[in-house]
């Protein structure tokens, strides 16, 4: 996907899916706009997003990022966070910066009303888990 995006140089990147798809879209957006970045440098090593040691690159200069969630739970379509997993080591690297906020989120409540009950209940549990993590 990243290779193809560099070939046709889109002015808009749309992520459609759940939280993992949103995170993958954000990562692809970063890699498209700033192929020189090192994710180990960008990985969150701090407790407060405002007190970071790494200056995140300016986003949105080549393409807008639009998030279209198909499930509820992570809230990735409206948060400045993304998680990338190193396939070789299995280590997850959280990225956090307000530059990762999508330009727009298109949320269709009817989509959840017509989703399978299993997806809806799993999304609800995920949303509850995300909520509880903020308290811990």
Role assignments for model-derived ranges:
Residues 5-11:
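Glycine-rich phosphate-binding loop signature in dinucleotide/nucleotide-binding domains
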Residues 19:
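Acidic-aromatic/histidine active-site loop/patch
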Residues 23-34:
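DPxDG-like acidic metal-binding loop motif
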Residues 35-134:
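A glycine/threonine-rich phosphate-anchoring loop and its flanking beta-alpha core
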């Amino acid at each position: 996907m990243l290779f193809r995006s560099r070939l046709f140089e889109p002015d808009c990147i749309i992520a459609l899916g759940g939280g993992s798809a949103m995170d993958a879209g954000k990562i692809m957006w970063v890699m498209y706009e700033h192929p020189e970045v090192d994710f180990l440098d960008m990985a969150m090593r701090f407790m407060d997003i405002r007190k970071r040691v790494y200056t995140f690159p300016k986003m949105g200069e080549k393409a807008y990022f639009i998030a279209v969630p198909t499930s509820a739970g992570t809230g990735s379509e409206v948060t400045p966070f993304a998680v990338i997993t190193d396939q070789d080591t299995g280590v997850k690297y959280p990225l956090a910066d307000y530059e990762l906020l999508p330009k727009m989120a298109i949320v269709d409540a009817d989509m959840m009303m017509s989703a399978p009950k299993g997806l809806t209940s799993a999304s609800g549990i995920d949303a509850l888990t995300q909520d509880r993590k903020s308290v811990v």
